[in-house]
């Protein structure tokens, strides 16, 4: 039957480029399944450039993936509808304050409250680029670290781990974030409330990862 077509193979792509179309992001998250994906970008502007294009407007996807909420799309170009159950997507971005403002234009679009933000002052110290005996090349160094992370990942696949908070830890968690939320209520602004609530969740996630 010539009408039958072979099924297109779907590869697993764990490292998604920051400049990826919305439809491709859907497809990658679907194909990766529980492994999920991560976006690494040394320049926030790379993602800003994609989000400013018609093909790359996917703030909603990032917001949904932060809470593993099911996402779906149906476009003629994609053929059958795409459904992604409990998408898992992480992002690690670096950039200047101006680049960050270009990415998160307002506190009310939901993306800001879903980000963990780390700021640090610049420490200007000159590091000579001259080669030194016994010096480790950066790429080789991070390749070695990558091998260690891969080993940890493979170990956890064979030995699933569940992190459980004690009653005292739950009490401390609730006390701290309830205090933060009370401060927001006093200010009379709604947007920071979402930041406090979501960061209460992220504190638990970080505790699980560090454990």
Predicted regions: what is each one?
Residues 1-102:
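Conserved ASCE/P-loop NTPase catalytic core
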Residues 64, 73-88, 101-211:
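Phosphate-sensing "switch" segment of ASCE/P-loop ATPases
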């Amino acid at each position: 039957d010539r009408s039958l077509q072979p099924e297109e193979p779907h590869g697993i792509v764990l490292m998604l480029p920051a400049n990826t179309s919305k439809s491709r992001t859907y497809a990658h998250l679907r194909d990766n399944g529980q492994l999920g994906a991560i976006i690494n970008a040394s320049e926030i502007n790379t993602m800003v450039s994609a989000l400013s294009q018609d093909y790359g407007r996917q703030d909603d996807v990032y917001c949904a993936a932060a809470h593993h909420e099911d996402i779906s799309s149906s476009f003629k170009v994609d053929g059958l509808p795409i459904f992604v159950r409990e998408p898992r997507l992480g992002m690690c971005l670096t950039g200047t304050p101006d680049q960050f403002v270009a990415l998160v234009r307002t506190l009310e679009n939901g993306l800001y409250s879903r980000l963990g933000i780390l700021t640090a002052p610049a420490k200007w110290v000159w590091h000579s680029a001259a080669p030194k005996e016994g010096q480790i090349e950066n790429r080789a160094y991070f390749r070695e670290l990558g091998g260690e992370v891969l080993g940890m990942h493979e170990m956890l696949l064979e030995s699933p781990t569940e992190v459980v908070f004690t009653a005292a830890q739950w009490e401390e968690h609730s006390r701290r974030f309830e205090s933060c939320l009370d401060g927001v209520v006093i200010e009379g602004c709604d947007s920071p409330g979402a930041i406090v609530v979501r960061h209460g969740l992220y504190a638990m996630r970080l505790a699980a990862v560090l454990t």
